[in-house]
Amino acid sequence: MIRSHMLRERAERLLPGGVDSPVRAFRAVGGEPPFLVKAEGACLWDADGNQYLDYFGSWGPMILGHAFPPVIEAIQKQAAFSTSFGASTPSEGDLAELVVRAYPSMEKLRFVSSGTEATMSALRLARAYTKRKYIVKFDGCYHGHSDGLLAKAGSGLATFGIPGSAGVPEEIAQLTLTLPFNNLDAVEAAFAAHRNEIACIIVEPVAGNMGCVVPDEGYLQGLRELTRREGALLIFDEVMTGFRVAFGGVQELRQVRPDLTTLGKIVGGGMPCGAFGGPAEIMDLLAPLGPVYQAGTLSGNPLAMAAGMATVSHLESSKEWLYPQLEQMSAAVAQGVAEEAARAGIPLTTNRQGSMFTWFFTGQPVRDYATAESCDTRRFAQFHRGMLDHGVWLPPSQFEAAFLGVAHTMHHVEQTVTAAREVFAAMQS
């Protein structure tokens, strides 16, 4: 990969680590990351002309595939009028109406430019509403890189084995209570120790940043009951799961209604976009109506609104067949690779919720961060490199979920399973 190598050398001179987001550096899996220049449907192309089958989907947004024509057309049409106004536009209301239809728990919402902004703003709102200062999050759940949410987070922190981030004052970190995922007893104990002090629980209702970890039956409902009893808010971080596992996210699947919801990734159709919302009683605390300040130059950016409208409207009109198709394809590829691992005698545990999944290199169930951490990351790195050599691009970390989109076909599934068979055989030799 001569061209990618040259681009990498230039990037390392100009960007810290040669990247704008740490996991992209491939440090956890080894080798040099290819530099991508084109994508269409379920396929990627690098600067050297190599083609790959994509199972990371830009970390989740590309549920309709890359360069989906209605999305591209919507962006091009809007760009001809302006890429940014910094003022109110009709498209904000258009997309907001779609989101509210999909997520009835969100009576009102506000658009921002990233998932990090959405979660950061939701926490500020929760603290203002409850007049409390502590928050509860869970080991391995990643909610963006704001200071108060980097304690024992997943994603890149898990990839690099870092418990938190330098530069976060101890006084801020102490206000975040980090508990094991899927453990209601630990949550009960935290509320008992901090009676009338906890503002909210924030949770990935299906975790994706320690790999895909599914909540135990009754866990989310238990969090809902606990927060109601204790006067705290429940925040579902559906940045990854929103419009992904179902049109209405995990809250639709599990029939649990949170107080606040954060969205990102798919809601912006691949453009920088996030959103947070909930009941009007809470949301109206935001300026200009209330005392909670939040603002952004590019919030509700018309390009993001156009891409989001094209994406979400297609998902809404197609949801009766689209989500069952994603389920069928995802089950086929997840099970197919797992069967090849079993034939090769390689311990593998598959976790999946709809079209997001992870192959954990362990023979034990993975239901929290501790069990995810016990996986054989060396073997995952071998698998990742082997699959990349076979033209299959997986997330470059054991602790990141993989994604499948509607552009994937059964031919792609067969290609992936065949590649896995050959890679597992090589790993055993």
Curated annotation (Swiss-Prot):
It catalyses: (S)-4-amino-5-oxopentanoate = 5-aminolevulinate. The modification N6-(pyridoxal phosphate)lysine is found at residue 265. It is found in: Cytoplasm. The keyword Amino-acid biosynthesis does not apply. Its EC number is 5.4.3.8. Pathway: Porphyrin-containing compound metabolism; protoporphyrin-IX biosynthesis; 5-aminolevulinate from L-glutamyl-tRNA(Glu): step 2/2. Keywords: Cytoplasm, Isomerase, Porphyrin biosynthesis, Pyridoxal phosphate. GO terms for molecular function: glutamate-1-semialdehyde 2,1-aminomutase activity; pyridoxal phosphate binding; transaminase activity. CDD domains: OAT_like. Homodimer. This is Glutamate-1-semialdehyde 2,1-aminomutase. The lineage of its organism: Bacteria, Pseudomonadati, Acidobacteriota, Terriglobia, Terriglobales. The gene is hemL.
